[in-house]
Structure formats: structure tokens, C-alpha cells
Swiss-Prot record:
Keyword vocabulary terms for this entry: Acetylation, Cytoplasm, Nucleus, Phosphoprotein, Protein transport, Repeat, Transport
Lineage, top ranks: Eukaryota, Metazoa, Chordata, Craniata, Vertebrata
Identification of the protein by name: Importin-11
Function: Functions in nuclear protein import as nuclear transport receptor. Serves as receptor for nuclear localization signals (NLS) in cargo substrates. Is thought to mediate docking of the importin/substrate complex to the nuclear pore complex (NPC) through binding to nucleoporin and the complex is subsequently translocated through the pore by an energy requiring, Ran-dependent mechanism. At the nucleoplasmic side of the NPC, Ran binds to the importin, the importin/substrate complex dissociates and importin is re-exported from the nucleus to the cytoplasm where GTP hydrolysis releases Ran.
Gene: IPO11
Phosphoserine sites (modified residues): 343
Length: 975
């Protein structure tokens, strides 16, 4: 590409690519895509985005194309890689001038320089760091800032490399430039502190921006640049200096008010200081040991004393609390139970912690957390009134403790209470003691204090197990509080029902459950929505609990289910609907079939909710989960849901529909339970199997469920299903077997085995293309035992239950192997006998014995030659299945199922599904469960004797080991 002529053309196309008109935009994008691999294209882009007279949008696009080009074509091994000559020119051009006037473009240029640095620095680009260091010293404000911005992005990128050689290079870089980085940061920080007193906002903002960038560089160097940072005086000097700098910056917040343009940058800088400490503690806990005392003193004074008044802000308090939490909970600082087994570093850190966390300090922290930070704020109470659903969602967990004040204070309380429970338990018990009896509804402060203390008692439930008689407290104090219906008492009604939910799995006598259910029924009718939602949560925890008893719950089931359904209709937010649906699902799951009389309203409502939730895939997932439990609870009656259920399954499992990304896993589970509980096949249920072929092509983690679904169809209606879908299914299986794991192969073959078991005549015909693959695997002695076992299971079914098909298969394989049929059969029997030990399932072992015995009687010399092996397998099978009757002393086949008896289902067991019943009926037709192996052997040997005559038969029996013959005779006594 000639630069001069090309620049004009590329500039024109880039201009077209910024157009809003797709007719202009699309051809331009196509042209740029073609140029991506042209030599010289990136040099042209560099010329364009460094030309400040051109349109900003065009320059922005040029930078983006350059950045993408680095990702795709900068590496030497990449297809269409840039030449070394062009890369040298580009590297030089990128760091010639740091004078980009537009902030967004400057950031993108800094990022792309960092991307090149990741690949080329320092080996191919040794001049980058020295150039940056010189450039950040210049007096020109713009150049200095842009160089500093680039310096930060380069440092950040190099710090993120993880290979050992790259880490070593970064360590070398860090030790070489750390002093300079420190002095640079100190210079900009001092400048900023001087500017603050001047009141010049522009100058303050400019110097603060440089302070922030230089601190970002130092953070990466400090945290990632040293193996043993505590041995480096500059590093430890910088870290110790942070506390003084933090005080200075916090004091600045008095003069830089919340409405000042610099306020946001100031708070970001203060937070960045705390991030340096948190990151360093996380990466180098033992190097942090000299900083433990100072960190705790600093954080506790600003968060729990008047020192912080007027200067702290929420995010800073959260960071300080996280610092305390990380020191308290740090496993590196916890000695072993046997102190002698702990390292000196651990003991040193532990000693510092213990010296700091004295009884007065812990007591004050605990009291301040509860009486100050746990109190519901004005903002929260306003939100409760104006947006009750938003208020309940605000309280969600996850990682919110890292960023939000309330979750952060609660997690800190839990960790400190756990670590120092012997000290803090009496403190909390004393706070509880002072709050006995009802609270005056007119005294809002007293109500909020009680709410905060109850919150603490709930959070510390496990630690207070031995110290609180919760059952008595529930009866005498908590239950009466739930009955106070005054509107101003609602924070306590909500808190008490939440508190019970926290204790339910810790300590709550089973006999008290009915009293709790009564209270829940009342609270689900509370006037306040927040109270109702919290009550639903506690109901879920109660129903989920290990000691839940259905018989205690059933008297309240109708009322609770009706009230939960009303709550589901009343709430409007997606998250709240999901939450209430999960509670409903949980109830349905626990009571199972007992739910049937009460689900009519929910069944009518779910289609409407499904339609309304078209844009909310997570809510649809919750609906799918509810449907799964509904189908399981309804059993065969779930057939009445098909007009709604089957289209839902169809959409959720259709990989051509975008929602499948969210819905597929739950959709497959719903499909499976629908099949398992279906009393009979319907055309619509059969039709949705069209979704299966693309699912099998995905080869995802959902394959196992897909195989279960296919089995479900085979058990439900094998003939109709196989005639409709077996050809396509067989093709999918053949493709899968080429590329799937060993475990996956076994799953595929188990489906085939099931088809042969359910339909011995049609099955082998439909899966005919797979059977040569199985036969070949047996003959060649498949090395994985679990695969070989499955091969023999499949072949055993064909040999035993479809002899004519086996003969045609043997004939086909003889042609393929270019062998005589008899010779091939002999090889197969020999391999079967040799690998019998691969089969571990008793059913398959009996099947093998029956299958090989089915070859008798025979005058075929090959079969007679293998007679000894067949008898060996048969006797092994007898050992597997025969049990001795202690009364008569005779043997009987324990696998025989003579009649269909419905097993009694205990309360804890799930009733049998329709599929379970189908499997039972199938077993009653399966030779493995209907043919006595003992009888079968006797009849086959008798027939062989009649065919050969006494003398010929005796000669045959003499080929069998005498010990085996003795065992056989013992099993056949009485015949």
C-alpha cells in the first residue's frame, strides 16, 4: 500500500463507515475487512488517527481497527501476520508524540500501545519504558498526562502476564523503575495538596488526575512486581506512607465538598489507596504483617470512632471494613490447634491481632456495628414505603459485601463474632436482655434498635447455639411480637419472621412447627408487602429444613398455597416473582402428590405469566423450575397441562431460538419429567422430539439429559417412536460415536441396549448401522472395560432375542473381515469368554450366560469347540444369581420376577412415576427376569445330550474343568 495514495482512499472508506446509512456503511465495512491483511494498512491507520485535523469519529474508528489488528495479526505465528519492518515503523510512530487532545481517543491509544507492549516489550521494544519515563517528566501538561496514562496501561498489562518468564521480566522492570514511580507519585501528590489551598478547581483537577494515574502505576508495581516485597525498603516505605497520605486526602474532603467537580476524582483516589492495601494483603499476607497494627488502628478509628465524622463516605467505610475483615479472617494468620505446628510468620501475625483486639476494642466494635450500622436508615425506610419490592431485592447476597455498606457490615459482624465468640457472646446476650417484652410503637428509635439487635442474633445463630434457649424465646417473646399488628411495628414483624428463618435449621423444636405455620399463615395476610415477602422466604427455609415433616404441614397447606399464589399475583417486579415462584416450587416439591387439589389456580396463571415474561428469561427459568415440580406432583394428571407444557418445552429446547441459551437446561429437565410422568404418548409429545437432533450435535454438558429423554421415549412408545425417529437418531449416534468420550460412548450404547430390550424385533433393524461397530469392537477386544461391557450387553440382546438378525449380522461381518462365519463366531465367543470379567452388573452377566447358551444345542464344531467357555460363563452366572433357600437347601434364581406387586411407599420416598411402572412391566417380559438360568442350562444341556448321544455328550463335558462340572452339578440338583 503506497501511503500517500492509500491514505486518501482509506480515509474516504473510514468516513463512509461512520455513516448512519446502512447502504453506505455495509460496503465500507466489507472493504475495511478486506484491507485488514494488506501490508501498509496499519501504517495508514496510524497516520489517520494521529492527524488531529480530521473528524473525531473517523479517527476513533481508525484507532479501533488498529486495536483489533493487533489482536489478530501482530503475533508472528498469526495468519497474515504483519511484517517485522512494518511493526518496527508502527512501534516508533506510536510513541513519537503523546499529544492526543481527545480523552477517549487518548485512552484507546494507550490501550493499544499496552497491547503491543504485552507481545513485544521488552525484547522487541526496549525503548518503550525509557521513552515513557522521559515523557512523564516533560512540562507540557497534555503530553505529561498522556504519557502517564500510557505508562499506567502498559504497567497494568505487563503486570497481568502469568507465565514464569514474563513474571521474571516484570520483576526486573518493577525493581528498575520503582524509585522513579514513587518519586513521581510523591511529586504529583504534593502538587495536588498545594493546589487545594489555592482553590483553583482546574489546577486541582489536573494535578489530582496525575496523582491518581501515578498511584495506579504504583499499585500494579507494588502488588505484582516483587516476590518478597517486605524485603524492599522503598515498597514498605510507600505502604507505610499510605496511612498519612490517606489522612491528608480525607481532610481535603472537608474543603472539596460533594458538589465540587473534583469530588469524584478525590473519592476515587482515596478508594485507590485502600485498594493498594487490600490487594497487597490478598497477594502477600506475610509481607503485610508489619502493616497489620497500623491498618487496624487506622480503619477502626475512622469507622468506629468520631475521627471519621465529617470526612468519611460510604465506599471508604466499606473498604475499611473489608480491610478489617480480611485481617480477621485471613487463614495465613490463623495458627494450627497445636501452636508448635504453626510457622513463625503466622504466630507473629496472630500475636499482633490478639494484641489489638482487646475486650474493650471488640466490645466497642460489636456495639457500634449493631447500634449504628445495623440501624435501618431514613433512605431505607423511605424505600420500604415507596418501593417495597426494590427494598427486598436490595438485601440480596453474593459479593455485595465487597461494595455495599449493609451487606459489608453484616459480613464483618459474622466474621468477628465467629473469631471472638467467647468474648462477644455475653455482649450480645446483654443487648438481648435489655430488650425483653414489647416495645412502644410510638418510640421509633427503640423499634429500630430492637430490629438491629434481632438482626445480630439472627446472623450469629450458629455461634449462639449453646447460649440461647430459642424455643422458649420463640414462645414467650417472638410469637407475641408477631401478633402486634400496628403499622409502625412492621419492621419488627419482618425482622422476627426473618430471625426465625435464620434459627430454623440451627435450633427449633419440631413440636413448635405448627405454631410457626399458624404465624406464617397470618403474616402472609399482613398489610405490608415487605412483611409478606419476608414471610415467604422463611416459609421456604422451614420447608427446606431437614426436620420438616409433611404431616405437620398438611393442615396448613391449602391456606399457605392460596396465600403464596395471591402474593405471586400481587408482586410486579421480575426478581420478586422469581423469588415467590421458588417458594411455591419448594412447597410443591416437599408435599409432592398432596399438592394436587390446590394447584388449579397456579396452573391457570402460569401461561399468562409465561406470556408476560417474554423479555425476562430468568423469570422464565423460575417458571420452568415450578413446572418441573408441578409435573412431579401431578404425576399422570400432568397430561392435562400439555396444551401449555409442550409449547414451553418446544421453545426452551429449540437451539434455533435465542432464549434457549437461558432456558435449555431447565427445559430439558422439564421435558424429561414430563416423559417420566406421561401415561401415554400423544402426537404433540412425539413431535417435539424434532428438537433433539440439533441438541445432539451440540455435544454439550446436557447430553446425559438428552440420552435420558431418548430412553424416556423408548420406554413410553418404542414402536411409534422408533418408526418415526430411529433413522435420524441412528445417524446422530454414528456421528457422536466418532468424536465422543468413552463415557459418552457408553451412554449412547446404553440407549441402543434399551431399544433392543424394549423392542427386540424392531430395535436391531432400526439401529442396524451401529451394530457392526459394536461387533467389531468385541472382535478387536475393546480395551476399556466399561465400553466392552456395554458392547457385550448390546450383542447379548441381539443374540438372545433376535437370532435371525444375529445370523444376518454375522454374515455381513464375515464378508467385512473376509472370514468364514463359523470362524468369526468362534472368535467372538472366545473374546466374550475372555472378557466376561469386564462385566460387573449382575443383569448383564446373566444376559451373557443366556445369550451364549442360546447357541446350544449345536452340532457346529466351532460352537462345540467353545463349549467349555460357554459352560464356564454359565457357572459364573449361576454364582451371580443363585441364592440358597435356607429352609429347603435348594437354589433359586434371585433375578426372577414372577408377579407385579406395588411396593409400599413410605412418607420419605417418592411414589413411582409412570416410567417406573413401565420399567417394571418391561422387566416382566425380559428374559433376564423371566427365564431361570438354572432351568435354561439344564434344558440346553439335555438338548445337547439328545443331539450328540450319551457318549458324544460325555466327551464334550470332559473338555470342562472338573471343579466347574462339580459346581454345575451342585446347582442343578433336583433336575
Amino acid at each position: 500500500m503506497d501511503l500517500n495514495s492509500a491514505s486518501t482512499v482509506v480515509l474516504q472508506v473510514l468516513t463512509q463507515a461512520t455513516s448512519q446509512d446502512t447502504a453506505v456503511l455495509k460496503p465500507a465495512e466489507e472493504q475495511l475487512k478486506q484491507w485488514e491483511t494488506q501490508p501498509g494498512f496499519y501504517s495508514v491507520l496510524l497516520n489517520i488517527f494521529t492527524n488531529h485535523t480530521l473528524d473525531i469519529n473517523v479517527r476513533w474508528l481508525a484507532v479501533l481497527y488498529f486495536k483489533h489488528g493487533i489482536d489478530r495479526y501482530w503475533r508472528r505465528v498469526a495468519p497474515h501476520a504483519l511484517s517485522e519492518e512494518e511493526k518496527t515503523t508502527l512501534r516508533a510512530g506510536l510513541i513519537t508524540n503523546f499529544n492526543e487532545p481527545i480523552n477517549q481517543i487518548a485512552t484507546q491509544i494507550a490501550v493499544l500501545i499496552a497491547k503491543v507492549a504485552r507481545l513485544d516489550c521488552p525484547r522487541q521494544w526496549p525503548e518503550l519504558i525509557p521513552t515513557l519515563i522521559e515523557s512523564v517528566k516533560v512540562q507540557d501538561d497534555l503530553r505529561q498526562h498522556r504519557a502517564l496514562l500510557t505508562f499506567y496501561h502498559v504497567t497494568k498489562t505487563l503486570a497481568s502476564k502469568r507465565l514464569a518468564a514474563d513474571r521474571k521480566l516484570f520483576y526486573d522492570l518493577a525493581s528498575g523503575i520503582y524509585n522513579f514511580a514513587c518519586s513521581l507519585w510523591n511529586h504529583h501528590t504534593d502538587t495536588f495538596l498545594q493546589e487545594v489551598s489555592s482553590g483553583n478547581e482546574a489546577a486541582i483537577l489536573s494535578s489530582l488526575e496525575r496523582t491518581l494515574l501515578s498511584l495506579k502505576v504504583l499499585r500494579k508495581l507494588t502488588v505484582n512486581g516483587f516476590v518478597e516485597p517486605h524485603k524492599n525498603m522503598e515498597v514498605m516505605g510507600f505502604l507505610h506512607g499510605i496511612f498519612e497520605r490517606l489522612k491528608q486526602f480525607l481532610e481535603c474532603s472537608r474543603s472539596i465538598g460533594t458538589d465540587n467537580v473534583c469530588r469524584d476524582r478525590l473519592e476515587k483516589t482515596i478508594i485507590l489507596f485502600t485498594k493498594v492495601l487490600l490487594d497487597f494483603l490478598d497477594q502477600h499476607p506475610f509481607s503485610f504483617t508489619p502493616l497489620i497494627q497500623r491498618s487496624l488502628e487506622f480503619s477502626v478509628s475512622y469507622v468506629f470512632t468520631e475521627v471519621g465524622e465529617g470526612v468519611t463516605f460510604e465506599r471508604f467505610i466499606v473498604q475499611c471494613m473489608n480491610l478489617i475483615k480480611m485481617i480477621v479472617k485471613n487463614y495465613a494468620y490463623k495458627p494450627s490447634k497445636n501452636f508448635e505446628d504453626s510457622s513463625p510468620e503466622t504466630l507473629e501475625a496472630h500475636k499482633i491481632k490478639m494484641a489489638f483486639f482487646t475486650y474493650p476494642t471488640l466490645t466497642e466494635i460489636c456495639r457500634r456495628l449493631v447500634s449504628h450500622y445495623f440501624l435501618l436508615t431514613e433512605e431505607e425506610l423511605t424505600m420500604w414505603e415507596e418501593d417495597p419490592e426494590g427494598f427486598t431485592v436490595e438485601e440480596t447476597g453474593g459479593d455485595s459485601w465487597k461494595y455495599s455498606l449493609r451487606p459489608c457490615t453484616e459480613v464483618l459482624f459474622i466474621d468477628i463474632f465467629h473469631e471472638y465468640n467467647q468474648t462477644l457472646t455475653p455482649v450480645l446476650l446483654e443487648m438481648m436482655q435489655t430488650l425483653q417484652g414489647p416495645t412502644n410503637v410510638e418510640d421509633m428509635n427503640a423499634l429500630l434498635i430492637k430490629d438491629a439487635v434481632y438482626n445480630a442474633v439472627g446472623l450469629a445463630a450458629y455461634e449462639l447455639f449453646d447460649s440461647v434457649d430459642f424455643d422458649q424465646w420463640f414462645k414467650n417473646q417472638l410469637l407475641p411480637e408477631l401478633q402486634v399488628i400496628h403499622n409502625r411495628y412492621k419492621p419488627l414483624r419482618r425482622r422476627v419472621i426473618w430471625l426465625i428463618g435464620q434459627w430454623i435449621s440451627v435450633k427449633f423444636k419440631s413440636d413448635l412447627r405448627p405454631m410457626l405455620y399458624e404465624a406464617i399463615c397470618n403474616l402472609l395476610q399482613d398489610q405490608d408487602l415487605v412483611v409478606r415477602i419476608e414471610t415467604a422466604t422463611t416459609l421456604k427455609l422451614t420447608v427446606d429444613d431437614f426436620e420438616f415433616r409433611t404431616d405437620q404441614f398438611l393442615p396448613y397447606l391449602e391456606t399457605m398455597f392460596t396465600l403464596l399464589f395471591q402474593l405471586l399475583q400481587q408482586v410486579t417486579e421480575c426478581d420478586t416473582k422469581m423469588h415467590v415462584l421458588h417458594v411455591l416450587s419448594c412447597v410443591i416439591e416437599r408435599v409432592n402428590m398432596q399438592i394436587r387439589p390446590y394447584v388449579g389456580c397456579l396452573v391457570q396463571y402460569l401461561p399468562l405469566l409465561w406470556k408476560q415474561s417474554e423479555e425476562h428469561n430468568m423469570l422464565r427459568c423460575a417458571i420452568l423450575t415450578t413446572l418441573i415440580h408441578l409435573v412431579q406432583g401431578l404425576g399422570a394428571d400432568s397430561k392435562n397441562l400439555y396444551p401449555f407444557l409442550l409449547p414451553v418445552i418446544q421453545l426452551s429446547t429449540d437451539v434455533s431460538q435465542p432464549p434457549h441459551v437461558y432456558l435449555l437446561e431447565d427445559g430439558l429437565e422439564l421435558w424429561l419429567v414430563t416423559l417420566e410422568n406421561s401415561p401415554c404418548i400423544t402426537p404433540e409429545l412425539l413431535r417435539i422430539f424434532q428438537n433433539m437432533s440439533p441438541l445432539l450435535e451440540l455435544s454439550s454438558e446436557n447430553l446425559r439429559t438428552c440420552f435420558k429423554i431418548i430412553n424416556g421415549y423408548i420406554f413410553l412408545s418404542s414402536t411409534e417412536f422408533l418408526q418415526t425417529y430411529a433413522v435420524g437418531l441412528c445417524q446422530s449416534f454414528c456421528e457422536l460415536l466418532k468424536e465422543i468420550t468413552t463415557e459418552g460412548q457408553v451412554q449412547v450404547l446404553k440407549v441402543v441396549e434399551n431399544a433392543l430390550k424394549v423392542n427386540p424385533i424392531l430395535g436391531p433393524q432400526m439401529f442396524q448401522p451401529i451394530l457392526p461397530y459394536v461387533f467389531k469392537g468385541i472382535i478387536e477386544g475393546e480395551r476399556y472395560p466399561v465400553v466392552m461391557s456395554t458392547y457385550l450387553g448390546v450383542m447379548g440382546r441381539v443374540l438372545l432375542q433376535n437370532t435371525s438378525f444375529f445370523s444376518s449380522l454375522l454374515n455381513e461381518m464375515a464378508h467385512k473381515f473376509n472370514q468364514e462365519m463359523d470362524q468369526l463366531l468362534g472368535n467372538m465367543i472366545e473374546m466374550w469368554v475372555d472378557r466376561m470379567d469386564n462385566i460387573t452388573q449382575p443383569e448383564r452377566r446373566k444376559l451373557s450366560a443366556l445369550a451364549l447358551l442360546s447357541l446350544l444345542p449345536s452340532d457346529n464344531s466351532v460352537i462345540q469347540d467353545k463349549f467349555c467357555g460357554i459352560i464356564n460363563i454359565s457357572v459364573e452366572g449361576l454364582h451371580d444369581v443363585m441364592t440358597e433357600d435356607p429352609e429347603t437347601g435348594t437354589y433359586k434364581d434371585c433375578m426372577l420376577m414372577s408377579h407385579l406387586e406395588e411396593p409400599k411407599v413410605t412418607e420419605d420416598e417418592e411414589p413411582p412415576t409412570e416410567q417406573d411402572k413401565r420399567k417394571k412391566m418391561l422387566a416382566l417380559k425380559d428374559p433376564v427376569h423371566t427365564v431361570s438360568l438354572q432351568q435354561f442350562i439344564y434344558e440346553k444341556l439335555k438338548a445337547q445330550q439328545e443331539m450328540l448321544g450319551e457318549q458324544g455328550f460325555q466327551s464334550l463335558m470332559e473338555t470342562v474343568d472338573t471343579e466347574i462340572v462339580t459346581q454345575l452339578q451342585e446347582f442343578l440338583q433336583g433336575f
